[in-house]
């Protein structure tokens, strides 16, 4: 179930979801390199253990592994029990685990990368979309993972974060989660009106989105449809709103969202603009932010920006 590469003497403890590869693995590396004890989580135990070994080969002996399926609330509870027993508290939670909500027909990724080499970002993204579909099942899984999964993990670990003298939550978001992608003005206003928005309302909107998706009513209702990735955009917008609600309800915690940029990961078929080292900077910055800093905010890479 779990494994580690070393000591428990480091003062601060962090959990990183989806930490076995790409951006998540790099966030783990940067945190561990700066003296934080890291609990790297992944759904696949073998891949998670291999990731810990990779970091161990870099001389990072302060990384532990624990299995976590963010879409399973009982899995999040097991992780919380492990953290409580081993460390007694949690200082940093990085909710990184996410899926695109699409199926791809790109075929050989290396050939695709060669085909799009030299194209600008918008053209590369357009070519990616041409090879993707958004079936209902994948859209449902996307909301379950990116929005509901983030909530489940956060709720399971919340009391441990409150046991820290400086609890921080960093939710890895996306430019696609900005409210500008909704065509319905009422959705934009409601999701941006945090004083009157509730978690229950977000859950209700999640159900409405899936119903409209199944009924073919996304465009008519005003959900994000232009350019594709509808479920991904909605899931990140809901995650952003949930983060802001949580920040309002728990002012002692520092809770922020970070868009890492268009990063060279498996999700982008390695055709992004930024390396994982560059993409992880914003998340690392907020994870290591001093007490009393920004909460309820959004970073575009490393710069504060609006949610709209």
PLM regions with names:
Residues 152, 237, 257-265, 269-308:
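C-terminal helical subdomain
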């Amino acid at each position: 179930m779990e494994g580690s590469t070393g000591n428990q003497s480091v003062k601060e403890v962090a959990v990183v979801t989806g930490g076995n590869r790409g951006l998540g693995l790099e966030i783990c590396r940067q945190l561990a390199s700066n003296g934080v004890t890291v609990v790297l989580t992944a759904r696949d135990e073998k891949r998670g253990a291999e990731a810990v070994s990779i970091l161990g080969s870099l001389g990072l002996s302060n990384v532990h592994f624990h299995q976590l399926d963010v879409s399973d609330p009982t899995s999040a509870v097991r992780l919380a029990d492990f953290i409580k027993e081993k460390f007694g508290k949690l200082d940093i939670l990085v909710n990184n685990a996410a899926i695109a909500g699409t199926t791809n027909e790109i075929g050989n990724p290396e050939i695709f990368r060669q085909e799009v080499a030299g194209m600008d970002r918008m053209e590369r993204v357009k070519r990616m979309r041409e090879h993707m579909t958004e079936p209902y099942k994948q859209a449902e899984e996307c909301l379950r993972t990116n929005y509901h999964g983030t909530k489940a993990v956060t709720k399971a670990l919340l009391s441990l974060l409150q046991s820290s003298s400086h609890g921080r939550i960093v939710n890895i978001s996306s430019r696609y989660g900005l409210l500008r992608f909704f065509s319905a003005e009422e959705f934009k206003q409601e999701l941006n009106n945090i004083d009157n928005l509730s978690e229950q309302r977000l859950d209700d909107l999640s159900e409405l989105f899936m119903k409209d998706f199944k009924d073919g009513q996304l465009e008519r209702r005003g959900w994000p449809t232009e350019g594709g990735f509808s479920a991904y955009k909605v899931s990140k917008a809901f995650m952003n709103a949930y983060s802001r609600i949580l920040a309002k309800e728990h002012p002692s915690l520092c809770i922020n969202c970070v868009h890492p940029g268009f990063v060279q990961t498996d999700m982008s078929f390695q055709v992004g603009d930024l390396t994982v080292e560059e993409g992880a900077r914003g998340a690392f910055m907020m994870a290591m932010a001093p007490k009393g800093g920004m909460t309820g905010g959004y970073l575009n890479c490393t710069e504060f920006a609006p949610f709209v």
